[in-house]
């Protein structure tokens, strides 16, 4: 499924899409954290589906299908652990930490990629949670990547409301999607085609696939708005003196 991007959005459309995107990314971040009983109840009573469907429909013009959740919280948690933490024989389907996927490292050491992601976070005033706040964030966990996309969507909406140029935050969203979010979602969606035992909740399987499709369409939408993504190497080759200190995000 693809977002509707055939015509440039009006002011009101752009604001509505930014707010719907914020909701969708934030709901994704919630879903990919370790399951808690409140999330299971939201799956059972339909409130999680209702929230995703509202955002998804606003972005794509299509309803979001509802999957049947596990009846017991223990089954939801067991499926998540088997898929993403340690499955049968200690083998999970896929880690939710980007730094544990060689395909995403592209020959770089994990600390370097962590530093790159933290540069995004710091630029927009975010910091890592610490143990005295109840949890410790892993900056390369899929939930953190999706939460950051929600923050960028929120900032885009704020810029539109305030009459400011949303271009800088849109360029940041484009760069973050291309470099981190889309490849991570693509990898996990591909891996989840294989069954796990116990099975992963069908809502999470669908959400992974559909978030990847939305990430793809969002990259195309942003490219039309602020230009296509260019790697640091490409910028350096074309303008070596300026690229080293260029701030694309305002």
UniProtKB/Swiss-Prot annotation:
N-terminal signal peptide: none
Recorded superkingdom: Bacteria
UniProt keyword annotation of Chaperone present: yes
One GO CC term, this protein: cytoplasm
Start and end residues of each stretch annotated as Disordered: 231-250
Location relative to the cell: Cytoplasm
The entry's keywords: Chaperone, Cytoplasm
Main localization (coarse): cytoplasm
InterPro entries xref list: DMSO/NO3_reduct_chaperone, DMSO_Rdtase_II_chaperone, TorD-like_sf
Family from the record: Belongs to the type II DMSO reductase enzyme chaperone family.
Function, as annotated: May function as a system-specific chaperone protein essential for the assembly of an active dimethyl sulfide dehydrogenase DdhABC.
Protein name, entry field: Dimethyl sulfide dehydrogenase assembly chaperone protein
Gene assigned in the entry: ddhD
């Amino acid at each position: 499924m693809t977002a509707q991007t055939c015509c440039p959005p009006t002011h009101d459309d752009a604001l509505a899409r930014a707010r719907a995107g914020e909701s969708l990314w934030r709901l994704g971040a919630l879903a990919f954290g370790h399951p808690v009983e409140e999330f299971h109840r939201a799956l059972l009573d339909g409130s999680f589906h209702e929230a995703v469907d509202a955002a998804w429909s606003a972005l794509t013009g299509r309803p979001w299908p509802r999957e049947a959740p596990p009846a017991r919280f223990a089954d939801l948690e067991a499926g998540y652990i088997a898929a993403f933490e340690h499955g049968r024989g200690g083998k999970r389907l896929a880690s939710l930490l980007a730094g544990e996927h060689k395909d995403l490292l592209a020959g770089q050491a994990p600390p370097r990629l962590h530093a790159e992601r933290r540069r995004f976070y710091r630029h927009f005033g975010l910091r890592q949670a610490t143990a005295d706040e109840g949890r410790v964030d892993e900056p390369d966990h899929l939930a953190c990547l999706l939460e950051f996309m929600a923050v960028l969507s929120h900032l885009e909406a704020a810029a539109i409301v305030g009459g400011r140029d949303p271009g800088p935050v849109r360029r940041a969203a484009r760069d973050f999607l291309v470099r981190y979010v889309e490849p991570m979602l693509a990898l996990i969606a591909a891996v989840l085609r294989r069954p796990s035992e116990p099975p992963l909740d069908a809502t999470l399987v669908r959400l992974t696939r559909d978030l990847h499709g939305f990430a793809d369409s969002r990259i195309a939408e942003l490219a039309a708005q602020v230009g296509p993504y260019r790697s640091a190497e490409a910028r350096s080759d074309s303008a070596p003196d300026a690229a080293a200190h260029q701030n694309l995000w305002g």
